[in-house]
Every structure is written in C-alpha cells, then in structure tokens.
From Swiss-Prot:
Gene: rplN
Pfam family, one: Ribosomal_L14
Main function: Binds to 23S rRNA. Forms part of two intersubunit bridges in the 70S ribosome.
TM ranges: none
SUPFAM superfamilies per the UniProt record, alphabetical: Ribosomal protein L14
The protein's assembly and partners: Part of the 50S ribosomal subunit. Forms a cluster with proteins L3 and L19. In the 70S ribosome, L14 and L19 interact and together make contacts with the 16S rRNA in bridges B5 and B8.
Name of the protein this chain belongs to: Large ribosomal subunit protein uL14
Length: 122
C-alpha cells in the first residue's frame, strides 16, 4: 500500500530515478493506493539529460508494491520494491521502455501500453 510521503522507484527510462508521493488520486478520503492506482508525485532523483527533471510534479501509476495485491482466485502477488511508471494525461507512459516485471492487474485499468512494453507480466 502506497500512501503520502511514500517513495517509489521509477520503472521506466523517463529520466527520473525516485519519486515521492504527494497524493493518491481517487477521492478526498483516499489514504492508500495499490497496483494500478494513479498518484501525484514529485521527482526526488533524476538522471542528467532525462525527459523529467528533479523537482518536477508528475503523475505516475503504481506497477509494483511490497504489500502486494489480492487476486480473484485468492492468491497474492508481492514484489521486492515499490515502483511506478510516469504517465501523461492520456495514461500513456512518458518513457519508451519499462524495466522489471509488472502486475497483470494493469490490464483491467486500461494501461495496455505499459503492459505491452513490460518485459514480464506476472
């Protein structure tokens, strides 16, 4: 579960390395986010020459969480890190590559471009 002030690793080549969550979108009472949720973040670390710079406010979708997500069949999927992909207003990724596995649940939230770019879908 991702909440305000959580740090996310960036799983794309947009130029950011680490994000700090400012807000979980989806209602005024919403406290936590899980895989497939959109969050507003600020870039805390960035690589030189990237698309995004340190201090930029961006939107990202959560693709991996340590706490995991429950599936329809009762199983859970957990990852070793919390990670996100920076997206545009039309839910397309800002980067051109995705690093690491992503959860199958992203298909249900219409992030098909991220799923197609990912090297592995679990």
């Amino acid at each position: 579960m991702i909440q305000n002030e959580s740090r996310l690793k960036v799983a794309d080549n947009s130029g950011a390395r680490e994000l700090l969550v400012i807000r979980v979108l989806g209602g005024s009472k919403r406290k936590t986010g899980n895989i497939g949720d959109i969050v507003v973040c600020t870039v805390k670390q960035a690589t030189p020459g990237g698309v995004v710079k340190k201090g930029d406010v961006v939107k990202a979708v959560i693709v991996r969480t340590k706490s995991g997500a429950r599936r329809e069949d009762g199983s859970y999927i957990k990852f070793d890190e919390n990670a996100g992909v920076i997206i545009n207003a039309d839910k397309s990724p800002r980067g051109t590559r995705i690093f690491g596995p992503v959860a199958r649940e992203l298909r249900e939230y219409d992030f098909m471009k991220i799923v197609s770019l990912a090297p592995e879908v679990l």
